[in-house]
UniProtKB/Swiss-Prot annotation:
Sequence positions that bind Zn(2+): C13, C16, C35, C38
Chaperone as UniProt keyword: yes
Official protein name in the record: ATP-dependent Clp protease ATP-binding subunit ClpX
Binding site for ATP: P119, T120, G121, S122, G123, K124, T125, L126
GO molecular function: ATP binding; ATP hydrolysis activity; ATP-dependent protein folding chaperone; protein dimerization activity; unfolded protein binding; zinc ion binding
An annotated GO cellular component: HslUV protease complex
Record-linked PROSITE patterns: CLPX_ZB
Domain ClpX-type ZB per the UniProt entry, residue ranges: 1-54
Keyword ATP-binding: yes
Organism lineage string: Bacteria, Pseudomonadati, Thermodesulfobacteriota, Desulfuromonadia, Geobacterales
Signal peptide segment: none
Native source species: Trichlorobacter lovleyi (strain ATCC BAA-1151 / DSM 17278 / SZ)
């Protein structure tokens, strides 16, 4: 029941009792009133409860099973079936290990950090992002090419944890159960198989620096970034339960694998050349730790990334599927934008195939699809908001290949077609 000051006829908040003169806003409900201060307090209580739930990380009793994780990945990532299974199992085991820590005398379970190998635009980053979104954990992306050993010009590896802290709004508990994706990890391989006597700022040195945070350490993280603010207080972050996913294209690794396979087949008198004529993507599926060692990684670094997932190159059919099938497919995003203007957007089958072929020609994989679409759609997206009579836009292969204008269906034409 609402409270009223009968002498002054002033309304009061049903929860704190303050009058309408004491608060900025008083909102009326069925026989009750609530002030802006009580609303803000309720929001703070709810936000704190949500924050506490997030800080606990994924509940093992509610943790999705590997099949459920893969089904979620299927909604956003086309193909790459084996890699999705590897990731689903690794992520499930990782968070199960966190929620059920080993007791004294128990078998200690190794951390399931993951190494993803695959060509540009095959879905490495998307897989990691989708996993983090499903599990509702903080997520950060780092570029290995920007990393150097401490004391050299470039980013310290601790900045990776700083990015994760920022994604967790500086909540250390949440950050300690987050996911980090390190891209271009192939770029920090040693340039030669034998150890160098000189300092390798971008190779073995970075591997050694990354090794500590990947395997698990208590890192001292400067909240404002390291070198420019030497006097600041440090945050202590335990990286033992952070899942690290490293990815790269690994150009040239197929040659290392091919050489190993070739040596095994030479003694059997087989047609070696024919056996070795395989696509790079197929060869990456056969990668072993020994191949990575020969490629330029130190044994300790390989040992901290026990789960290997190889992605295959995307063909034309897969790229067409990527354009249309995932929940957030590019064509669906554009159709939503046009729908906001009251216009239907349609892509012909020929247009979809043309976009896929152009991406293959550019050798950019799925990553290049957006750039191709944006180039084709720029002019029409510029014009449509100013044209009130357009009801449908049709994108054909000529729009993609020959830069022709899309077919526009106007209101009168649409009405005639219905009649």
């Amino acid at each position: 029941m609402s409270r009223r000051d009968t002498s002054q006829h002033h309304l009061t908040c049903s929860f704190c009792g303050k009058s309408q003169d004491e608060v900025k806003k008083l909102i009326a409900g069925p026989a009750v009133y609530i002030c802006d201060e009580c609303i803000e307090l309720c929001n703070d209580i709810i936000a704190e409860e949500i924050r506490m739930e997030d800080a606990l990380g994924p509940d093992v009793t509610k943790l999705p099973k590997p099949k459920e994780i893969k089904e979620f990945l299927d909604e956003y990532v086309i193909g790459q079936e084996t890699a999705k299974k590897v990731l689903s199992v690794a992520v499930y085991n990782h968070y199960k290990r966190i929620e059920r820590p080993a007791k004294p005398g128990d078998v200690e379970m190794q951390k399931s950090n993951i190494l993803i190998l695959g060509p540009t635009g095959s879905g490495k980053t998307l897989l990691a992002q989708t996993l983090a979104r499903m599990l509702k954990v903080p997520f950060a992306i780092a570029d290995a090419t920007n990393l150097t050993e401490a004391g050299y010009v470039g980013e310290d590896v601790e900045n990776i944890i700083l990015s994760l802290l920022q994604a967790a709004d500086y909540d250390v508990e949440r950050a300690q159960k987050g996911i980090v994706y390190i891209d271009e990890i192939d770029k920090i391989a040693r340039k030669a198989e034998s150890p160098s006597l000189t300092r390798d700022v971008s190779g073995e040195g970075v591997q050694q620096a990354l090794l500590k945070i990947i395997e698990g350490t208590v890192a001292s993280i400067p909240p404002k970034g390291g070198r420019k603010h030497p006097q600041q207080e440090f945050l202590k972050v335990d990286t033992s339960n952070i899942l690290f996913i490293c990815g790269g294209a690994f150009a040239g690794l197929d040659g290392v694998i091919q050489q190993r396979i070739g040596k095994k087949t030479l003694g059997f008198g087989a047609d070696v050349k024919k056996k070795l004529e395989k696509k790079a993507g197929e060869l990456l599926l056969q990668v072993t730790p020994e191949d990575l060692l020969k490629y330029g990684y130190i044994p300790e670094f390989i040992g901290r990334l026990p789960m290997l997932a190889s992605l295959t190159e995307l063909d034309e059919d897969a790229l067409v599927q990527i354009l249309t099938e995932p929940k957030n497919a590019l064509t669906k995003q554009y159709q939503k934008l046009f729908d906001m203007e009251g216009v239907r957007l349609r892509f012909t089958d020929g247009a979809l195939v043309s976009i896929a072929k152009e991406a293959l020609k550019r050798n950019t994989g799925a990553r290049g699809l957006r750039a191709i679409l944006e180039g084709a759609m720029l002019d029409i997206m510029y014009e449509i908001p100013s044209q009130n009579t357009v009801r449908e836009v049709v994108i054909s292969e000529d729009v993609i290949y020959h830069k022709e204008r899309p077919l526009l269906v106007y209101e009168q034409s649409a009405s005639s077609a219905v009649a």
